[in-house]
A protein has these predicted regions:
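N-terminal module-boundary/linker segments of secreted carbohydrate-active enzymes
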Residues: 1-30, 35, 210
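Extracellular/periplasmic catalytic domains that process cell-envelope and extracellular macromolecules
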Residues: 4-9, 41-43, 103-105, 174-175, ...
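Stable alpha-helical elements in mature extracytoplasmic
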Residues: 25, 29-32, 92-99, 166-169, ...
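Aromatic-lined carbohydrate-binding/catalytic grooves of carbohydrate-active enzymes
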Residues: 36-174, 178-185, 189
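Short, hinge-like loop/turn segments at secondary-structure boundaries
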Residues: 128-131, 200, 229-231
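Extracytoplasmic, non-cytosolic globular domains
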Residues: 169-218
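Substrate-binding cleft/loops of secretory-pathway carbohydrate-active enzymes
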Residues: 218-233
Length: 233
């Protein structure tokens, strides 16, 4: 577990959501990265964050994002993987590593958006949890769902295999070279204490330091002590 201090100052960068929603492509990410490297990096800007939709082919509009059954790509362990239509360099199992390598070569850092829980496709297929004898249906809490995006169920952190699932996510992100994770559906309308803890534990087990951002805001002030102990922002 890394003890390095991360994000001593508020991170400065660009998030794809406001401009592109769920439709952002690799070329658009690179174009913004190039502009940042050439014009803003000298002032402290360094993060490029890909928001929702990097795992969802054909998800271009808000209406598709709000669909009751969003199309999402998963691997054999029930983890979201990259839509190669939007991100061609992710082909052949490369994931976001080629894009991360490109950003790192320009002195920048790559972030991604994730959701609390496990994809509905993983539960439907009852995919195995990497490194365990458990499966998706052993850890899922079907009564716990995001109020605005319906691609996930919550995870029951009292179940064996639950922490291991989150661990497997950050193992994957580590292999891609991800630097920043925006984890959504954790603060409001329900404060998902146990899954916040699980995500933090998973991130801290990796040698690679992850800046962890919890969403959606604003942060509930009654939980400020806990938040200070688990995330950077």
């Amino acid at each position: 577990e890394s003890t390095a201090i991360l994000a001593e100052r508020p991170p400065m960068g660009w998030n794809s959501w406001i401009c592109f929603g769920t439709s952002v492509t690799e070329d658009e990410v690179k174009a913004n990265a190039d502009f940042m490297a050439e014009n803003l990096k000298k002032y402290g800007w360094e993060y490029i964050v890909i928001d929702a939709g990097w795992y969802a082919p054909g998800m271009e509009t808000l209406e598709q994002y709000e669909s009751s059954t969003p199309h999402q790509i998963i691997d054999k362990f029930g983890r979201l993987i990259v839509d190669t239509e939007k991100f061609p360099s992710a082909k052949n199992g490369e994931g976001l590593k080629p894009l991360a390598d490109y950003l790192h070569s320009r002195g920048l850092k790559l972030g991604i958006h994730i959701m609390r829980g496990i994809p509905i496709q993983a539960v439907e297929a009852n995919t195995p949890i990497k490194g365990t004898s458990y499966r998706a249906r052993d850890i899922v809490n079907t009564d716990s769902r995001c109020k605005w995006y319906f691609g996930f169920y919550g995870i029951d952190m009292s179940k064996p295999g639950a922490q291991e699932y989150y661990d497997s996510l950050f193992e994957l992100y580590d292999s891609w070279g991800i630097d920043y994770v925006k984890a959504d559906d954790l603060l409001s309308p329900i404060y998902a204490h146990d899954e916040i803890e699980a995500i933090t534990k998973a991130a801290r087990k990796r040698k690679r330091p992850f800046v962890l951002s919890l969403s959606p805001g604003p942060a509930p002030v009654e939980n400020i002590k806990h938040l200070q102990s688990v995330a950077q922002l």
